[in-house]
Amino acid sequence: MSPAAIAEAHGDPYVAAIRAVSNGSSSYMNGGAVQGMKRTTFLFDRHLHKDFPVIVRGSGSNLYTKDGRVIFDATSGAAVSCLGHGNKRVTNAVYQQMASGIPYLASGFFGNETVDDLCEELINGTGRKMARVYLTGSGSEAMEATCKLARQYFYEKDKSTPRVNFITREGSYHGNTLGALGMSGHKARRAPYTPFLMPNVHHVSSCNPYRQRLPNESDALFVSRKAAELEAKFQELGPETVIGFCVEPIVGAALGCVAALPGYLKAMRDICHRHGALFILDEVMCGMGRTGTLHAWQSENVAPDLQTIGKGLGGGYQPIAGVLISQKVVNVLYNGTGQFIHGQTYQGMPVQAAAALEVQRIIRQHNVLDNVRIQGAYLGKLLKQHLADHPHVGDIRGKGLFWGIEFVKDKKSKMAFDTKLSVAQRIHDTAISHPYNMTMYPGTGTVDGMCGDHIMLSPNYLVTKEDVEYIVRTAVDVIESVLENL
């Protein structure tokens, strides 16, 4: 995208910040207030021993701290802020909806045109491959709703249905609520809560060529082996007992941007449909444009029966996620009880819909996904160019503006670092501190759900070529600094 196009997409005379690293001319490179300023808070933070930078405002890719630093947001938070921070069009849309006097409506009582317009925008974005949208407040809520909807689909058809089992994958993450966590295959996240998790969720291996490909095994043979494994799991459980198979097309937080190989999604869907089960995609993190198509499945045109969406849906301007529902699922409920036995207070709020609708309109009207593909390819190219030969970089993978780097103690054996070293967390902590001042998303459990380290880079969709070069230059400096001092 040209600078003018970027400015227009931001809704104001925004000019992408020039990251003047080489000559040290930027104020954030020349010091500023003392870091580590103690923060007094009664918030029960997720990390009780950390003193986080206090952010006071944001603009584009920049976050401004209370102590005078400027932090470049190279991860869009958790791959959320897809249009960057402070977008005038989106904030104005939210303001207008608030000013209407109806930021909230009880979704069980009333309809709303803003909500309807958003749902139409989303269904059109699937090429009408999906039929309806169920809106929620978070990705975890969306997965909870998906599990219940999938079960109700079969219950409506036959109240004595034996379909009670889900199949998901090892090394997956589908959310933090008990149902969503039960669907996940990330051992470390599950461990404290195992006694409470659904017992009827069964796992097959992930699709991770870096760690699972056999010697001389082609992509086609690899996919065939994975298909055989899923088929075997259906047979083990009894095909008539399986509700569905749930998969992330590109695994985000749990594995660090590991994409399914070409043909994998179709092979998995074919098995599900052969046995009358539902094919379910979790695109909360990898979807809504993050990988260069609005939905990750569109790159191979493998539409699901149910799909979760979130994060980039509202771009961080409101908490919103949802479930895209195929016509066959809609038909069963429509011709049955006529209702979905589920609901939460803050779902489908007009103010949430206003934010998401404006985000999606900007993406469509300004062909923003062209920039995702162009800058994403450049980001991947530069990462591989500068880090592929590093002795402790095992793999660099990703698509669009969604890239992961996996770290290893030994490149040949692919042995992970000792978990006590907290490699990914060290990289994050170093990156976000002066003089680097950039976010890098840390992840652990990359190898087996317990050990292994990776980081992710997922900048906003409006980044420039110069931004990408700055991201890679900074990431390389941080990684080299941390790894050489372990």
Protein language model regions, located:
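Conserved N-terminal phosphate-binding loop of PLP-dependent enzymes in the Aspartate aminotransferase
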Residues: 2-486
